[in-house]
């Protein structure tokens, strides 16, 4: 039987989540990929896997998703966003004194609550696996470096590291490993000009590739 992996935030064709899904598929995994929009159906068809539309900030939707999965070996928590690539979150990109309560809560929901919900409801399944794996996609912003006007995003991504450390200790008795990946700026199809400027800050003169 093939191992089964669940990858969140895999709807963007040039994003990290979809790249991870492609790599897992190439390595023999059965997959469930999720996004908040219908474009996940297109990505799923491209890979020949199952795609589900789900808002991972809502516990009831996550619980329903996990009830529809019989076995699960790997969870990749990739859902989330920075305000610099989302016009819907422009008011998050401010100094802390200017961030509204609504923007603060929305940023933590998208970048922290999504990982909490998906991990919490997937644990009963992963604990049954012979080699369960949980991966959090964090960021260099927050845990390793500062970025101006990103207090919400940085806080959420740093908090993921604390979640990883705690989970790793708690779930070791089930043979589950828990790790975080902290990428820098990764090239996507969201803001080419911003990616070019970010690339100027690196030795190779370009952004990372998914």
Language model: regions and residue ranges:
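Canonical Rossmann dinucleotide-binding motif of NAD(H)/NADP(H)-dependent dehydrogenases/reductases
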Residues: 2-31
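Active-site loop of short-chain dehydrogenase/reductase
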Residues: 2-3, 71-72, 126-139, 173-176
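Structural signature of the Rossmann-like NAD(P)-dependent dehydrogenase/reductase core
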Residues: 7-9, 77-78, 132-139, 177-182, ...
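Catalytic loop of short-chain dehydrogenase/reductase
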Residues: 9-13, 99-101, 133-159, 164-173, ...
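Catalytic Tyr-X3-Lys loop
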Residues: 81, 93-116, 135, 160
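Conserved mid-core segment of classical short-chain dehydrogenase/reductases
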Residues: 82-105, 148-152, 190-192
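A glycine/serine/threonine-rich, flexible loop-to-helix segment
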Residues: 89-93, 173, 180-210
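Amphipathic alpha-helical dimer-interface segment in Rossmann-like NAD(P)H-dependent oxidoreductases
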Residues: 106-128, 168-169, 173
């Amino acid at each position: 039987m093939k191992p089964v992996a669940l990858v969140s935030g895999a709807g963007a064709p040039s994003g990290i989540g979809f790249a991870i899904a492609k790599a897992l598929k190439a390595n023999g995994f059965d997959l469930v990929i999720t996004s908040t929009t219908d474009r996940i159906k297109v990505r799923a068809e491209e890979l020949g896997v199952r795609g589900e539309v789900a808002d991972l900030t809502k516990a009831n939707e996550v619980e329903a998703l996990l009830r529809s999965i019989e076995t699960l070996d790997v969870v990749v928590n990739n859902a989330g966003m920075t305000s610099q690539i989302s016009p819907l979150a422009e008011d998050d990109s401010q100094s802390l004194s200017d961030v509204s309560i609504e923007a603060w809560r929305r940023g933590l929901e998208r970048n922290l609550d999504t990982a909490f919900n998906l991990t919490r409801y997937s644990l009963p399944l992963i604990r049954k696996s012979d080699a369960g794996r949980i991966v959090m996609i964090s960021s260099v912003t927050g845990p390793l470096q500062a970025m101006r006007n990103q207090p919400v995003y940085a806080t959420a991504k740093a908090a993921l590291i604390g979640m990883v450390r705690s989970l790793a200790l708690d779930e070791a008795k089930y043979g589950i490993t828990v790790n975080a990946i902290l990428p820098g700026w990764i090239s996507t199809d969201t803001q080419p000009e911003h990616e070019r400027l970010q690339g100027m800050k690196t030795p190779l003169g370009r952004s990372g590739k998914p």
